[in-house]
């Protein structure tokens, strides 16, 4: 039990869809969630606004547990997806685990429709300004598109790493050198490189150098976003993964690139009206 904190799930009444799905699905009906008229809940807006001013607390549990993951800030909010949509719950969880270092290639489909519904995008940032970097590709080439993102990120990280090593050779014995050596040891570890990159940036800002070393320092600071190892993802539905984009997906898997694949398998073409895909079951009724 975590005794030093109090936990509250604060609802923003102005962004509630009013669908009632949360109440229907809640295992503690009448005790935890009850639908009420909007005008009786507007006072909760003050509580919502106050909640946004609170400082972030260190997660007292491992985020890679069912319970611990829910103490992480979601970086997907107010998506505008269909009421009761099951896709957004999974996408939200991914942002709680990896969102502040996440690159996302999204195939056309439902996840693209609610993921970039003009004029807003539901993917957001934390208080440090970090959040998922999202882009969309068509059905047939999203897997290849995501690998292009992977290769681009790898090249940019390799270039920054080379500059860090060059500056390290010129600054032996400094706080930056110690931070850089630790970062290089954990270069390919996502969460460790994130923490170590903060130490590198802080040490760089205090480092007093001139000439070639100053140019290296400026370059690293300007490209500091690439110090942290990125979590690379491709999203798509079963229409993409099983049908239209299967050929590209097959090649990407065979290439053994460091990229994660998330298939939102609804067993139909959800975004275009429920047509059957290769994931559809024989004799099923889809709605």
Which residues does each PLM region occupy?
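N-terminal amphipathic, basic-rich helices that act as targeting or association modules
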Residues: 16, 68-71, 76-119
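Beta-sheet entry/capping signal
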Residues: 8, 24, 30-33, 100-105, ...
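Iron-sulfur cluster-binding cysteine motifs and their immediate structural context
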Residues: 1-4, 8-12, 17, 21-40, ...
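Non-heme iron-sulfur electron-transfer modules
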Residues: 1-8, 28-68, 130
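N-terminal leader/propeptide and maturation segments of large enzyme subunits in energy/redox metabolism
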Residues: 139-212
